[in-house]
């Protein structure tokens, strides 16, 4: 017998958010590790809000902020506005963050403002280090064998915001301007973005020139876990400089170890290989 296409919503429900999350879902194991790390950050969170202890409107709980930010990374949600939109209807996201089905979702601007407090107090770095400490306690890290890589991060700024440094006007005016920049000589020495002054006009390989930053990661090869990360301005030396800095950090943690480093051909430069400490062992990738 053919079923009918009807929809009847119950006035009451006895379902819990946990009932909608499969027992084998990877976020279950991740959430346990996340909550253990957040518990160890309680003293930091208390210091962050000492100036607001006398009263005022309650902020977003820092634990919920960090869980939401982690979801944004894991699921590649490109903006806070889209993240809040997904939290509104995604029961998995609500469960992971710690919001009930009845809880209101935060306004994106409020979320961004509260997130800034985390950044100012290095809470994100402390959270990363707490998770890394769990991996170390479980002997998931070799502390000797690493790989390094970098990637381009596009800035939230348009080409029209990239104007001469001595040109007046803010980012909105610059982006709204109708001037055609094509064919004009532009460089980071003479120009900057009025929307994001820290970004740099940069191209790599066959890619087009864009306003960008560079992200860098150091991975422990035993289980493929990221043990260090940096974001820098984009230039031709940033990848190698960041790699040397992260390898130096690894040496300080384990000074007696013989550290090996894997990298692609972009790091095969005479200013990098000798500085890394040993002669290279090259192997062609198939």
Please give the residue ranges for each predicted region.
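N-proximal short alpha-helices
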Residues: 3, 7, 56, 84, ...
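Polybasic low-complexity intrinsically disordered regions
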Residues: 88, 97-286
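Basic, low-complexity intrinsically disordered segments
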Residues: 2-5, 20, 32-140, 155
């Amino acid at each position: 017998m053919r079923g009918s296409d009807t929809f009847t919503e119950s006035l009451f429900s006895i379902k819990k958010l946990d009932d909608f999350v499969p027992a084998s879902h990877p976020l279950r194991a991740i959430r346990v590790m996340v909550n253990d790390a957040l518990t160890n950050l309680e003293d930091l969170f208390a210091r962050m809000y000492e100036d607001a202890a006398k009263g005022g409107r309650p902020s977003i709980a820092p634990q919920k902020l960090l869980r939401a930010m982690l979801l944004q990374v894991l699921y590649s949600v490109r903006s806070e506005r889209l993240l809040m939109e997904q939290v509104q209807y995604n029961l998995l996201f609500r469960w992971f963050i710690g919001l009930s089905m009845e809880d209101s979702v935060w306004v994106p601007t409020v979320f961004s403002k509260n997130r800034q407090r985390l950044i100012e107090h290095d809470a994100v770095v402390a959270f990363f280090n707490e998770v890394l400490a769990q991996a170390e306690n479980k002997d998931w890290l070799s502390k000797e064998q690493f790989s390094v890589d970098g990637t381009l991060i596009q800035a939230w700024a348009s080409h029209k915001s990239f104007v001469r440094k001595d040109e007046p006007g803010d980012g909105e005016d610059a982006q709204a301007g109708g001037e055609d920049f094509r064919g004009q000589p532009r460089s980071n020495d003479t120009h900057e973005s009025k929307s994001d002054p820290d970004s740099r006009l940069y191209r790599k390989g066959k890619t087009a020139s864009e306003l960008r930053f560079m992200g860098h990661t150091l991975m422990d090869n035993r289980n493929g876990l990221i043990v260090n990360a940096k974001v820098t301005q984009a230039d031709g030396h940033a990848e190698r400089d960041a790699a040397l800095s992260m390898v130096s950090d690894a040496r300080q943690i384990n000074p007696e170890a013989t550290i090996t480093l894997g990298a692609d051909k972009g790091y095969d430069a005479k200013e990098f290989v000798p500085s890394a400490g040993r002669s290279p062992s090259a192997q062609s990738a198939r």
